[in-house]
């Protein structure tokens, strides 16, 4: 039977393929899947970035980032952008929202560096601040981080030793040390820099296309490259005149109190800590990094102002 079937069965030769007319086949008409969810704006999914640095942040400069604030906004809207190395980058889809959160500690510290009348010391300080180099990194880790205290391994995890530490001062940055009135110049420029961030966020805000949130990073230093940083995000463009940094307030409790005191009408904000994996147990400790202990009012203040924690960024999962 098998031999008979092989002998008398149909054959399909390669030459017959060209004779086939697929247009004669009956194919179903593709139908787009239609799903209409019930209106619920609180459950819509949006994609964005709440931790973004530009060339205005010194650590970004160290990594060779030469992209400015306006370029960052255009990139968030989906425009292509060329990196310092010539690579063309573009998002697969534009973002729905973005907050540029450059380090507030750097506001005003490099604004004057384009002045041709700077002294030799001022020019040297500006070179250190603008050119990625190991020397300035060492200066910052020693000077701007304040006075360190030795760790106490006998203490339970998450409980920092209550030893007084000296918080760094506004004049710690090299560019704010040299020249007559250098510190006052940096403080004035810091206010002007912050005003520029507010202006550009408003400029690139496009309802229904891109929501630009005004923000910055609060970045106190810790020993051994520890991180205890927070991004400060404002709800509207009604924001304080100054961006409070770790040069103004020494810890998170004082940050929240300071922001509440300087926020005017229609001003609202939240903070988000990041890198809790490098905070040496302090992110959820009952002590601040400089030894201040949380009271009941402090916990309620944190509950009101810090409902979120960042869990992923360019450094990886935390």
Q: Each predicted region: which residue ranges?
A:
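Extended, charged catalytic domains and RNA/DNA-binding interfaces, predominantly
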Residues: 4-318
């Amino acid at each position: 039977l098998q031999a008979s079937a092989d002998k008398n069965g149909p054959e399909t030769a390669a030459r017959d393929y060209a004779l086939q007319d697929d247009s004669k086949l009956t194919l179903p008409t593709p139908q787009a899947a239609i799903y209409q969810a019930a209106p619920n704006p609180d459950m819509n999914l949006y994609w964005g970035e709440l931790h973004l640095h530009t060339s205005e942040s010194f650590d970004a400069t160290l990594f060779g980032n030469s992209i400015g604030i306006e370029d960052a906004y255009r990139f968030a809207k989906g425009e292509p952008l060329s990196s310092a190395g010539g690579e063309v980058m573009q998002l697969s889809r534009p973002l729905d929202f973005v907050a540029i959160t450059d380090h507030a500690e750097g506001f005003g510290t490099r604004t004057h560096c384009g002045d041709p009348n700077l002294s030799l010391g001022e020019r040297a300080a500006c070179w250190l601040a603008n050119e990625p180099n190991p020397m300035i990194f060492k200066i910052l880790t020693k000077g701007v981080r304040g006075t360190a205290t030795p760790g106490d391994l006998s203490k339970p995890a998450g409980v920092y030793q209550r030893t007084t530490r000296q918080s760094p001062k506004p004049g710690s940055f090299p560019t704010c040390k040299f020249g007559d009135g250098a510190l006052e110049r940096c403080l004035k420029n810091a206010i002007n820099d912050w005003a520029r961030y507010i202006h550009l966020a408003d400029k690139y805000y496009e309802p229904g296309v891109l929501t630009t949130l005004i923000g910055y990073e609060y970045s106190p230093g810790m020993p051994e490259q520890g991180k205890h940083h927070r991004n400060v995000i404002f709800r509207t463009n009604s924001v304080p005149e100054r961006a409070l940094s770790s040069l103004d307030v020494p810890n998170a409790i004082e940050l929240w109190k300071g922001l509440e005191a300087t926020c005017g009408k229609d001003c609202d904000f939240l903070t988000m800590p990041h890198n809790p994996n490098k905070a040496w147990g302090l992110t959820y400790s009952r002590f601040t990094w400089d030894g201040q202990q949380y009271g009941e009012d402090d916990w309620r203040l944190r509950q009101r102002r810090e409902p979120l924690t960042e869990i992923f960024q360019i450094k990886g999962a935390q």
